Amino acid sequence: MRVDDSVVTLQPSLSGADAHGTPAPANQLAEPLFYRRARGYVPRPVFLPKTEQNAPYVLGTGAELKATICLTRGAEAFVGQHIGDLENPATLNFYEEVAAHLEKLLEVRPEALVCDAHPDFLSTRYAEARAEREGLPLWRLQHHAAHAAAVLAENSHYGPALALCLDGTGLGDDGTVWGGELLFMFLLRGGRGIPLRGMTAPPFSYIAPVGAGLPGRMTLAGKHDARTA
């Protein structure tokens, strides 16, 4: 099976900070900051709260761009290797191969699936088809809430938190396109979102607004709205 290289940078270790919170020099202690997790770092778990020890095995199917999967086993979450954008049958086939390989490696069979709330993502369609085929429950998660939850879990923060999400676009809980919101998150109890003021978006493509890949157009749209408000 294909295995891509990981892409990381090193940052000063916060665990090596002094009593005043000043991080240790980068040449003394450093931790990897991932841009792309693959060779050498998969599968390594992100540890979840102890309360999740007896939780069901869950497969998170990710989104459409820079896709990967995540499989939980008790109080551990294993992020799959870098896959890429799900834009053609070959990439989708590799996506399914990665999911099957990780399940075999961890000796885990998912008992539930979590997918993006966007109905047209290929990862969502994969989750829907598999849930129907295997009789598994399927939960849908708003795109930016998933980003916020991942950051909180990676930093072992399980209490209440406010997360400012300035991602691209994602289908919101209210059926509109979100792309900047303040989310109240509580990993052990769920979360709710407060979108920032709406604005005009460029025309839609099949999957997402054109502005998702061309931020300059979103800037012009914001300037237009400010002038006409």
Q: What are these model-derived regions, one by one?
A:
Residues M1-A229:
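Short acidic/glycine-rich loops and adjacent helix/strand connectors
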